[in-house]
Amino acid sequence: MTFSIVARSTDGPGGEPCWGVAVASKFLAVGNAVPAAVAGIGALATQAEANLSWKGIGLSLLDEGATAPVALDRLLEEDDKRDHRQIGIVDVDGTAVSHTGSACFDWAGGITGTDVAIQGNILTGPEVVEAMKAAWDASDPTAPLARRLLAALVAGDEAGGDKRGRQSAALLVVSDGAGYGGMDDVAVDLRVDDARAPIGELSRLLDLNDLYLTASTEQEKVAITSELAAEIDGLVRAAGHPDLAAWTGTENYEMRVADDGSWIDVQVLAILRAGK
């Protein structure tokens, strides 16, 4: 009833590794059940007749030094319903494994490669996971992991996806020094719990996440000259704020404007000029 991709890349802040999961399903709030990840440890997706305890147990095993194959073996040997379970795991080094129990509803299966595990059940056919793997392989390895995961999810959906239909989707990416203010390991944690087109909505939310919760790149920073400062001052005052800092805080653009007022993000400047 679900298709997912679990992966590792090195596009985190400063080039640090990051891990993530993207998942979609004809199931309410799939993001509440399937994905789990911790920076510096790994990521996993537990699905089919999902054993949700595998999230905590699996990450604990990885944290203790188990490789993905060892962690998988431990999880399976302690679960009497292993034949009904499906799971994908990627460990700290990018070793990937995927398990599909023999009792999972057709079509069910998975594909693995370096840094990636893809799996699904109740799918239209193997073309779903194959399309996801092809999209992953074709993606730019330097691109943000969230974008690569989403592209794979879109490919799986377009190839047929869950044969029962669509309902929810989720995206989770972790990396040290990520998140709001760079003081967490959660770079992306987005969920569409109940929608006709959940993957499309997830894409819209990721655009917003990038704007509000991702730091500007050097290419996106516009130096605030005296001339631009005067323009900005007029714009923020017209919007009812005493200065740029007040406008920035009110509109939640803290990660897109320098604390010392030396630069402003090109997108945020466009928004300010448009009076939005």
Task: Give the role of each language-model region.
Residues E218-V257:
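A short amphipathic alpha-helical interaction element
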